[in-house]
């Protein structure tokens, strides 16, 4: 359970660690003598004292969180396509603005650690196109990650700016990332790198044009495909195809088909604003907004988030919820 800290009421100025029953230096316990031929007694090292986390005076863990939506990563900018150059610039911009990449489910489950004073940002990728994750072959025929695909660019950015982090949530369709001979290897590789796999359904249907059972069947078909590569992988999030939910939204949340069950914690929309923090009263995990990654929308919303009390800023402690007292009424009430 998280502890709550209201900044205006109890900003901690100093932390003192008191060690009880510790003998003075001159009275340190000598190493016991042992009979000849006996192994020496190894004294345990003294326990480490963890350094206290820095106090982040502007921490706001009820602030808004940008969840960015990408589709194709290609040479030229276009509709539903981000150019390779612009994607690189997006990551540089996010780093310089103080953001750290987190996987969707890790952050909203409270498992992602955002460094103190930095802000979380979730990158999502729909449609599992080849430009998101591509293999190339060297002269010896060995595979390597294309440095101009999304995964390659993310790895390069992380090497340049470790505080940016390495994360991303990829919403898969059937036959993900092209290169059909490598798709299973790619899914396992992505999980090994720490990325999150989400569902975008197998065939990307219009949910409002098919039956509930057809929806369940399509979701399960994608899940079974993922299990071929990563057995038992729990898909936590589903991006609604075309941003259209079923008439009964819960049909896409959990269910089963032919004895195979699925259970999603998060449903992703197509637009169109920053998301609410996990502990905000308006956070709705079954309708998570995203920001399309275009020059206009990124500039507009990232500038907006720089306004007072708008942006999530981490205190660095996952066990404590810190926020300005002006937002006291915005905290989600726990039952």
What are these regions (language model features)?
Residues 1-4:
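Positively charged n-region of N-terminal signal peptides that target proteins for export
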Residues 17-28:
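Hydrophobic single-pass membrane-insertion segments
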Residues 6-18:
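Hydrophobic membrane-insertion alpha-helices, especially the h-region
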Residues 124, 171, 198:
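Generic enzyme active-site microenvironment
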Residues 58-60, 114, 154-165, 179-198, ...:
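Acidic (Asp/Glu)-rich catalytic clusters
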Residues 134-159, 168-170:
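A short alpha/beta connector and helix-capping loop motif
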Residues 198-209:
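Substrate-binding clefts and substrate-entry loops adjacent to catalytic sites
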Residues 30-124, 129-137, 142-145, 209-335:
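C-terminal active-site subregion of NodB/CE4 polysaccharide deacetylases
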């Amino acid at each position: 359970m998280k502890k709550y800290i209201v900044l205006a009421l109890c900003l901690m100025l100093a932390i003192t660690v008191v060690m009880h029953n510790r003998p003075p230096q001159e009275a340190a316990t000598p190493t016991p003598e042992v009979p000849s031929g006996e192994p020496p007694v190894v004294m345990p090292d003294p326990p480490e004292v963890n350094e206290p986390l820095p106090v982040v005076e502007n921490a706001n863990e009820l602030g808004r969180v940008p969840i960015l939506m990408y589709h194709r990563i290609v040479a030229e900018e276009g509709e539903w396509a981000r150019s390779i150059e612009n994607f690189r610039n997006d990551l540089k911009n996010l780093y310089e603005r103080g953001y750290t990449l987190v996987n969707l489910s890790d952050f909203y489950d409270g498992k992602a650690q955002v460094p103190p004073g930095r802000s979380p940002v979730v990158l999502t990728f729909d449609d599992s196109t080849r430009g998101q994750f591509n293999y190339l072959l060297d002269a010896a025929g060995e595979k390597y990650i294309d440095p101009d695909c999304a995964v390659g660019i993310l790895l390069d950015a992380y090497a340049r700016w470790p505080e940016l982090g390495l994360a991303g949530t990829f919403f898969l369709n059937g036959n993900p990332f092209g290169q059909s001979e490598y798709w299973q290897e790619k899914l396992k590789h992505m999980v090994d790198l720490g990325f999150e796999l989400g569902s975008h359904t197998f065939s990307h249907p219009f949910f409002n044009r098919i039956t509930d059972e057809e929806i369940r069947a399509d979701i399960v078909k994608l899940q079974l495909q993922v299990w071929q590569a990563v057995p038992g992988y729990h898909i936590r999030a589903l991006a609604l195809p075309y941003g259209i939910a079923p008439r009964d939204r819960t049909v896409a949340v959990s269910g089963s088909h032919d004895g195979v069950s699925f259970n999603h914690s998060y449903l992703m929309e197509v637009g169109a604003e920053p998301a609410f923090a996990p502990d905000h009263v308006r956070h709705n995990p079954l309708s998570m907004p995203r920001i399309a990654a275009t020059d206009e929308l990124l500039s507009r919303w990232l500038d907006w988030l720089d306004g007072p009390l708008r942006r999530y800023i981490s205190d660095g402690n996952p066990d404590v919820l810190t926020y300005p007292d002006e937002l006291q009424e915005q905290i989600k009430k726990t039952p």
